[in-house]
Amino acid sequence: MADTTRKSGSRRLARERIAVLFARAAEFYPESPDRSNRCVELARKIGMRHRIRIERPLKRRFCRRCYTYLVPGSNARVRVHRGRVVVTCLACGHRSRFPVGRPRQ
């Protein structure tokens, strides 16, 4: 019984920490992109350690191949093509495609 409350409490704390790290990544990016990439790396590791998913809006802020924090216009190109938003990471060239239009059911 105590393990389940401890586990849920640590997961809640991990979610908060991940949100703080992504906020810090956005804050650090103009001065130090390497530091913001490190924040993304730490957030991913916390999520894996506690087996929690990173929320969709946060997940779309970094490249899935090189784990670079993405800022449109700076190190990411954003285009709309055939009903999808295509985000290209300018560090590694990886393209992420996200559907636009109908909401998910």
UniProtKB/Swiss-Prot annotation:
Coiled coil: none annotated. It is found in: Cytoplasm. Its cofactor is Zn(2+). GO terms for biological process: tRNA 5'-leader removal. Binds 1 zinc ion per subunit. GO terms for molecular function: ribonuclease P activity; zinc ion binding. Keywords: Cytoplasm, Endonuclease, Hydrolase, Metal-binding, Nuclease, tRNA processing, Zinc. Its EC number is 3.1.26.5. It comes from the Archaea. Gene3D superfamilies: 6.20.50.20, Immunoglobulin FC, subunit C. Its main location: cytoplasm. Zn(2+) binds at C63, C66, C89, C92. It catalyses: Endonucleolytic cleavage of RNA, removing 5'-extranucleotides from tRNA precursor. Part of ribonuclease P, a protein complex that generates mature tRNA molecules by cleaving their 5'-ends. Belongs to the eukaryotic/archaeal RNase P protein component 4 family. Consists of a catalytic RNA component and at least 4-5 protein subunits. This is Ribonuclease P protein component 4. It comes from Methanoculleus marisnigri (strain ATCC 35101 / DSM 1498 / JR1). The lineage of its organism: Archaea, Methanobacteriati, Methanobacteriota, Stenosarchaea group, Methanomicrobia.
